[in-house]
Amino acid sequence: MEPDDSQLSDILKDARIPDSQDIGVNLTQNLSFDTVQKMIDGVFTPIFSQGTEDSLEKDILKTPGISTIYNGILGNGEETKKRTPKISDAFEPDLNTSGDVFDSDKSEDGLMNDESYLSNTTLSQVVLDSQKYEYLRVRTEEEQQLVIEKRARERFIRKSMKIAEETALSYENDGSRELSETMTQKVTQMDFTETNVPFDGNDESSNLAVRVQSDMNLNEDCEKWMEIDVLKQKVAKSSDMAFAISSEHEKYLWTKMGCLVPIQVKWKLDKRHFNSNLSLRIRFVKYDKKENVEYAIRNPRSDVMKCRSHTEREQHFPFDSFFYIRNSEHEFSYSAEKGSTFTLIMYPGAVQANFDIIFMCQEKCLDLDDRRKTMCLAVFLDDENGNEILHAYIKQVRIVAYPRRDWKNFCEREDAKQKDFRFPELPAYKKASLESINIKQEVNLENMFNVTNTTAQMEPSTSYSSPSNSNNRKRFLNECDSPNNDYTMMHRTPPVTGYASRLHGCVPPIETEHENCQSPSMKRSRCTNYSFRTLTLSTAEYTKVVEFLAREAKVPRYTWVPTQVVSHILPTEGLERFLTAIKAGHDSVLFNANGIYTMGDMIREFEKHNDIFERIGIDSSKLSKYYEAFLSFYRIQEAMKLPK
């Protein structure tokens, strides 16, 4: 009951409640003394918090004889509780829990077993009766059951969302529908009876679980794919490009430098990426046949580099790019962080992109190692974070001078089984072995200059080399190309490059003649034959040559110092004088390693192998000096053996 005005005036007169207008100088101090006296008499009990009570207890008990006063002021322990009460009616029953129910540091089982929680309400709030409180009590069975059901529903939702994320990730990486169906079936067949939770369709958490299942089924039914095609009908000239798809769904493109190639890229995504900001990356890479294409298109160091000549003449930026984007309906940019890449910015909801590609270099400009590799055009579809979603590529791209003609000649013929045909670096007849192109017939020396025999031998070649009409020329080419034909084209034997043999005089010099080489691209093909044979000396002829050279070696040669020195060396001497004469004394280790210690040993090895110095490992720059000195010594020794 609130006091009226008359009662308030009486209280003010008694100085129990001071008035702000009548406060004197010492009124506050007197009031404090009166309050302390009332506390000592037990009339007034102050309001203390739990911390204040503990601190007062420590300070007051230090003074002797004050324990009785302390008990009167604070009362006994039964009246003032050490535990603070909790709020019971401040919120709804479902929310009558502490704020740390879903704390990650506490386990769910521990929260389920803890049936009571304490609030942070102080004792002063209870005394002042600011709101309705109820002291600590145990939850009823109905309240506890509601809390258990709510937590079980939340756990089920978290598990469902986790399974949905794992299913979508595995479906994106592996592309396996079986895995997606299995995971979706697991979520659909989850029984709420495991957690004793009644599934209510009107509950918000239950609706969330249904949405999770529907999203998983949507991801399962959506099949992602991406394709890259060349629009052949939009090419300016059909002869500038050839595009084909093999039975293994591998794509091949042969085009011309400076020709616009219309490209169309299509894709299909699930609804998670439908409204995302996507980007399309385009790369032109090279790879070996043994290398995996999937690795090569992602390797930042596998770009095809433009030649120096075209780079210096290029007018578009970047100057060193092998290709450029033209006539694109989307904005694009260039980047070289992860390889030379053109990036097209797609608008949300786009399902295709059309643009033109122009190549500003060609195969013949590249190095030999790069020409032996296969070039590939790859496109990547990335999300807004730069992560790859899908990719597609054209397995082989060739930039040649006549793409359509070369494709017909080398890929559309019946005998062209491999689409990755490469032009030979050398003509076929230069790669053939000497055994297959040399003339296998022996020429008799007596009849060598007989006109009749020579004419008879040249009749087949004359009939072929001088055809009467175009049909004979075609038949001649077919017979030459046929593997079952016995006719073998005649070609000049390459000159012998052995330095020791030519210096020794065993092989005569061969005069080089310009042959009219046969080429399939020539309008009038001719086959020119040359009748010749390699000179082979008999034993008697070889002996005469050696005797002649030995007699010639007796003539003193003052123009070259090593010749004068080796003329005084004996076969029984060591190698020191010989090596010193040619200023190669440090090469004695090579001779000793091969069992050559004297000049006689060197003569013996030379008669076995005329390329003795190449065999023991003499440097090629010193071979001329070695052979000149040793052959002079060898001829002198042979001349000394001849009868006088």
Curated annotation (Swiss-Prot):
Classification via Pfam families: CEP1-DNA_bind, SAM_CEP-1_C
Entry keyword annotation includes RNA-binding: no
Chain spans, region Required for tertiary structure stability of the protein: 528-555
Predominant subcellular localization, coarse grouping: nucleus
GO MF annotation list: DNA binding; DNA-binding transcription factor activity; protein homodimerization activity; sequence-specific DNA binding; zinc ion binding
Gene3D superfamilies (alphabetical): 1.10.150.830, 2.60.40.720
One GO BP: intrinsic apoptotic signaling pathway in response to DNA damage
A cellular-component GO term for this protein: transcription repressor complex
Effect after changing E552L: Disrupts homodimer formation
Places the protein is found: Nucleus
Cofactor: Zn(2+)
Record note on cofactor: Binds 1 zinc ion per subunit.
Residues that span the membrane, as ranges: none
DNA-binding region as annotated in the record: 223-418
Disruption phenotype: Reduced numbers of germ cell corpses, hypersensitive to the lethal effects of hypoxia, increase in production of males (Him phenotype), decreased lifespan and in extreme cases embryonic lethality. In cep-1 and prmt-5 double mutants, germline cell death and up-regulation of egl-1 mRNA induced by gamma irradiation is prevented. Double RNAi-mediated knockdown together with ape-1 abrogates the increased number of apoptotic germ cells in the ape-1 knockdown model.
Post-translational modification: Phosphorylated in response to IR-induced DNA damage which is thought to be mediated by akt-1.
Protein function: Transcriptional activator that binds the same DNA consensus sequence as p53. Has a role in normal development to ensure proper meiotic chromosome segregation. Promotes apoptosis under conditions of cellular and genotoxic stress in response to DNA damage, hypoxia, or starvation. Regulates germline apoptosis in response to DNA damage. Its pro-apoptotic activity is inhibited when bound to ape-1 in vitro. Plays a role in cell cycle arrest in the germline in response to DNA damage by UV-C light.
Subunit structure and binding partners: Homodimer. Interacts (via C-terminus domain) with prmt-5; not methylated by prmt-5. Interacts with cbp-1 (via HAT domain); cep-1 transcriptional activity may be inhibited by interaction with methylated cbp-1. Component of a complex that contains prmt-5 and cbp-1. Interacts with ape-1; the interaction inhibits pro-apoptotic activity of cep-1.
Protein family per UniProt: Belongs to the p53 family.
Name of the protein in question: Transcription factor cep-1
Lineage: Eukaryota, Metazoa, Ecdysozoa, Nematoda, Chromadorea
Gene that encodes it: cep-1
